[in-house]
């Protein structure tokens, strides 16, 4: 149960290594419920932040490769922007090529940073589709300046300790972002 002053230091949901960025949202009770679901181990898909020196580390999981990449993107964006009231106003299509799945994860996250830096937009959702010679990524974006900033904005994707693999419970990834 959240108490009156818990919005200042909200309780840490079970299953999360660090408090979810969404806990700083305007409605702490709803944010807490969404955060627990996003980071609850055993759910079919989700994401969470984990402690990592001065950088941002995101873990994500889903039944499919594309779902795992989607969760990694949402985890990244939610680490620095409150998406609770966000809705898509633009669609951006990018064709990306990668030799391996972890290269694709890096390429998608680099595109997220590029969109933010060049046009000031951030994804609120995305869809991936395999095509001849690559992957089409459709980003549903919104103007980042209309959202509340809740953390440091990532500047680059680090290749250090990058993990992306399929196991018997689906796909998992862990990626570090320089902030």
Swiss-Prot record:
Keywords: Calcium, Metal-binding, tRNA processing
GO biological process: tRNA processing
Family: Belongs to the archease family.
Protein function: Activates the tRNA-splicing ligase complex by facilitating the enzymatic turnover of catalytic subunit RtcB. Acts by promoting the guanylylation of RtcB, a key intermediate step in tRNA ligation. Can also alter the NTP specificity of RtcB such that ATP, dGTP or ITP is used efficiently.
Keyword Calcium: yes
Binding site for Ca(2+): 55, 178-179
Record's note on what induces expression: A member of the dormancy regulon. Induced in response to reduced oxygen tension (hypoxia) and low levels of nitric oxide (NO).
UniProt name for this protein: Probable protein archease
GO MF term set: metal ion binding
Organism: Mycobacterium tuberculosis (strain CDC 1551 / Oshkosh)
Lineage: superkingdom: Bacteria
């Amino acid at each position: 149960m959240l108490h009156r002053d818990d919005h200042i230091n909200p309780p840490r949901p079970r299953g999360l290594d660090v408090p979810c960025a969404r806990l700083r949202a305007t409605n702490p009770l709803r944010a807490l419920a969404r955060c627990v679901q996003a980071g609850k181990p055993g759910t079919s898909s989700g994401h969470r932040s984990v402690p990592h020196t001065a950088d941002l580390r995101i873990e994500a999981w889903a039944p499919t490769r594309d779902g795992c990449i989607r969760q990694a993107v949402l985890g990244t964006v939610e680490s620095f922007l409150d998406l609770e009231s966000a809705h898509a106003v633009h669609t951006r299509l990018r064709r990306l090529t990668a030799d391996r799945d972890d290269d694709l994860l890096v390429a998608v996250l680099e595109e997220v940073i590029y969109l933010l830096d060049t046009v000031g937009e951030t994804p609120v959702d995305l869809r991936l589709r395999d095509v001849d010679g690559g992957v089409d990524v459709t980003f549903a974006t919104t103007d980042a300046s209309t959202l509340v900033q809740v953390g440091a904005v990532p500047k680059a994707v680090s290749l250090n300790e990058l993990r992306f693999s399929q196991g018997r419970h689906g796909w998992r990834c862990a990626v570090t972002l320089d902030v």
